[in-house]
């Protein structure tokens, strides 16, 4: 009995001691483990751990980080937000229009590229009075000259001060109500929802196009290092994962990178890239990691990630606590291959969509501001964080992913089963009676629109059809073929020329193929591009070969959204080129679709009697002349404007089942395609 009482007393004493320990130390442990929960609707930055004073007590005075003594102060106007410091009433007419203050004195090549990218965009205006946003370049990287206060400053209201480098220009005037678009701003000075975080751009960053992502195999190859650590002097060093302390103490094997000779330009050759969060200069390594397909691992970052307002960086980067090196390394080693694959794919998409050129960075900045202006009509997160990205998914067309051709598969939907035929009638201006009857006979045709582009008067009579026929007169430019007419009521467009010659069966089969590939162009006659070594440029041929990269728009199916891109996204110079050289319009339209989809067009067969001819050729069966080739410099001018060559070659042609098979004709659905 006494033994039992002693055990009970001992158990009570242990319980009381444990309870006292919990009461005394529990609150401190909670403060150590959990950051405060953000209030609903409040902006959320990087985690701010509450135990900094506890951790510093374990360090020697010389080991404390230098930049931890005096955090950067918020800029003047820190109380500004979008509602109080920006007047959206100036943007109600034409949306976002940007005026750039002219530079004074000598400017750097980077600033010259910025000016060129804005002046060639749909946002630019020559008049400050008609501008919704006034842009001021703050600091010249080469000359170090600072901008002075402009005449229309108005306390900075509706102004955007652009800083390309983390080190700010010494201020000769107060920012007031101006927004700041700065490279790698610190989390203490950044105003969420008002300022815009930019990437740290190198001086030699290309104006347009840019180099593609360097990831060639999404699954890590055997022997490739798991970790790469950025260095203060530039370059990367790979980590031997056998030593868990290697990434933090510098004992790593040097890796020059694939095919690189200059250390400062070396791209990391690893699966994960460890990037310090203390030094703003480390942000310059962030873009290198994205381009290389190396998953960025940010160690307690103190700078805002670029475009964090719209880009979901949890899908492409990892934020880790630098105080837990062993746990971070173990977590990276145990990460599933599926997760690694998803992160690496997202790095390549983000690099190509928003960061590969100066033009994309500037246009992304303006799109972020335009989304704030539109409010409820802004891009949803899916459009920003899924290919092809918000720059190619114009919110002026729609903000619903279901309306864009490249999101059908992701949304589990498919386009409607009807199309609109758009027939371009140029000189000599004869009504395409047979073509209208053939197209109207399709069970999928919803309407026919005839674009009359001729000096001759309109015919008084048109053929009677089972579908509505609308004639639009007065459009003389070739680019008017690709205008987003409000009368087009279907997703699919069948673009035709008055000289086209197609049968109803050909139209039906081509449309069914397009329904399976709504983001691509489906056509009958193809052409291809090639690199001409002799002339040092791109060439174009309409000869029948085993490969093709373009289809003629004189007989092709595509989604109506590409009319919106053609009219509202292309630079005016390219549309003028299409009007002055009509044969260039096919190349230009194929460039647009290829740049969006990263895929080649699809070829479908046409009747046997037309195998040696183009469907745009006039007349009846028999040999017909080949379509005229574009001007020699056409494809090169378009490629220069895009900054790269988006066209891709294909060897695929889709035929109906049983096409030309030795079976009964009665068993074939599209038997007319094989008739002589």
UniProtKB/Swiss-Prot annotation:
Its EC number is 2.4.1.224. The chain crosses the membrane at residues 10-30. Glycans are attached at residue 269. It is a single-pass type II membrane protein. The keyword Transcription does not apply. It is an enzyme of class 2 (transferase). Residues 31-676 are lumenal. GO terms for cellular component: endoplasmic reticulum membrane; Golgi apparatus. It comes from the Eukaryota. GO terms for molecular function: acetylglucosaminyltransferase activity; glucuronosyl-N-acetylglucosaminyl-proteoglycan 4-alpha-N-acetylglucosaminyltransferase activity; glucuronosyltransferase activity. It catalyses: 3-O-{[(1->4)-beta-D-GlcA-(1->4)-alpha-D-GlcNAc](n)-(1->4)-beta-D-GlcA-(1->3)-beta-D-Gal-(1->3)-beta-D-Gal-(1->4)-beta-D-Xyl}-L-seryl-[protein] + UDP-N-acetyl-alpha-D-glucosamine = 3-O-{alpha-D-GlcNAc-[(1->4)-beta-D-GlcA-(1->4)-alpha-D-GlcNAc](n)-(1->4)-beta-D-GlcA-(1->3)-beta-D-Gal-(1->3)-beta-D-Gal-(1->4)-beta-D-Xyl}-L-seryl-[protein] + UDP + H(+). Residues 1-9 are cytoplasmic. Residues 618-631 have a biased composition (Pro residues). Pathway: Protein modification; protein glycosylation. The keyword Membrane applies. Its main location: endoplasmic reticulum. This is Exostosin-like 1. It comes from Homo sapiens (Human).
